UniProtKB/Swiss-Prot annotation:
It comes from the Bacteria. This is Anthranilate phosphoribosyltransferase. Belongs to the anthranilate phosphoribosyltransferase family. Catalyzes the transfer of the phosphoribosyl group of 5-phosphorylribose-1-pyrophosphate (PRPP) to anthranilate to yield N-(5'-phosphoribosyl)-anthranilate (PRA). Pathway: Amino-acid biosynthesis; L-tryptophan biosynthesis; L-tryptophan from chorismate: step 2/5. GO terms for molecular function: anthranilate phosphoribosyltransferase activity; magnesium ion binding. One of its GO terms (cellular component) is cytosol. Mg(2+) 1 binds at residues 92, 226. HAMAP family: TrpD. Anthranilate 1 binds at residues 80, 111. The keyword Acetylation does not apply. It comes from Thermoanaerobacter pseudethanolicus (strain ATCC 33223 / 39E). The lineage of its organism: Bacteria, Bacillati, Bacillota, Clostridia, Thermoanaerobacterales. The gene is trpD.
């Protein structure tokens, strides 16, 4: 199967969705040789991955993952592909906490650091989250308190079959975008940051095919995989069964432009402190970018009608201490579960 696929890819032909599914299934099974897997990954990188290919791969990875079956019918995720080289603090992690304080159910899917000094798993550990929590307890945490963390290696066990190859290749592959597309809770809403403008529309199309109801796939003009505050941001939104493209400018929402260095984080310990300071009400560019992205999460989470209202609600949740209280409440409940 893989040899046939390589022939096709090398001839610059796209795989059909079902072929891509079969290829990824074979890779996940552990039966594929490293050289064939490497050939597929590099071939795809050179050809460029199609929407059908990414969809097929994502479906196979979802089917090979340990699933988290939630009773709630609408759950969201806030995450990025990483790899944007921006050295920012963990914005989407702060956003997840604020969204859950507004009553949005958040299944935060993530891993340790890839391109930064601190991934969502690293910073959540610093904040007191048990990232190795068994799925059954994580499920209760999301259902009862509105937010839980799904540590990717715990759910995507078959990924160990490609970990060594990805490290050896040392270049971006399709797996860099598959992480955020394969949340084991099968979330219906998503704010997804990507490292390349060319990915926003295709990945929104993929999310649509995967059954996503509402999503914003975003990429800042400055290169960040967030809705940025140093420049406008490209957005491809999944809305009512279609993908629409537009641009968000922070100044239109009363948020002043920041400098990239204003948004930088350091290691997990410092990033956790940045998040706590924001939740305690500290003002400035770091809070601004969190509020703007939280507004998007509240919009995707169906608690506000638009970003303007989302910004008001996010600011309210911070200023009243409700967001910080929510974090305390989640950690307290986690302690009881453990």
């Amino acid at each position: 199967m893989l040899q046939e696929a390589i022939k096709k890819i090398v001839s610059k032909e796209n795989l059909e969705e079902r072929e891509a599914y079969a290829v990824m299934n074979e890779i996940m099974s552990g039966n594929a040789t490293p050289s064939l897997i490497g050939g597929i990954l590099i071939g795809l990188r050179l050809k460029g991955e199609s929407v059908e290919e990414i969809t097929g791969f994502a479906k196979a990875m979802r089917d090979n993952a340990i699933k988290l079956e939630l009773a709630s019918d609408y759950v969201i995720d806030t995450c990025g592909t990483g790899g944007d080289g921006g050295k920012t603090f963990n914005i989407s992690t702060a956003v997840a906490i604020i969204a859950s304080a507004a009553g949005v159910k958040v299944a935060k899917h993530g891993n340790r650091a890839v391109s930064s000094k601190s991934g969502s798993a690293d910073v959540l550990m610093e904040l007191g989250f048990d990232i190795e929590m068994v799925p059954e307890k994580t499920k209760r945490l999301i259902e009862e308190k509105g937010m839980g963390f799904l540590f990717a290696p715990k759910y995507h066990v078959a990924m160990k079959n490609v970990a060594g190859i990805r490290k050896e290749l040392g270049t971006r592959t399709v797996f860099n975008v598959l992480g955020p597309l394969t949340n084991p809770a099968f979330v219906k809403g998503q704010v997804l940051g990507v490292y390349d403008k060319e990915l926003t529309h295709p990945l929104a199309e993929v999310l649509l095919r995967l059954g996503t109801e509402k999503a914003m796939v975003v990429h800042g003009f400055d290169g960040l995989d967030e809705i940025t505050t140093t420049s406008p941001t490209f957005v491809s939104e999944v809305k009512e069964g279609k993908v629409i493209d537009y641009v968000i400018d922070p100044e239109d929402y009363g948020i002043p432009y920041a400098k990239l260095e204003d948004l930088e984080g350091k290691d997990a310990k410092e990033n956790a402190q940045i998040i706590l300071n924001i939740l305690k009400g500290e003002k400035g560019p770091k809070r601004d970018i969190v509020v703007l992205n939280a507004a998007a999460a509240l919009y995707i989470g169906k608690v506000v009608e638009d970003l303007k209202e989302g910004i008001k609600v996010a600011n309210y949740l911070i200023d009243t201490g409700l967001a910080l209280d929510k974090l305390t409440e989640i950690l307290e409940y986690q302690r009881r579960l453990n």
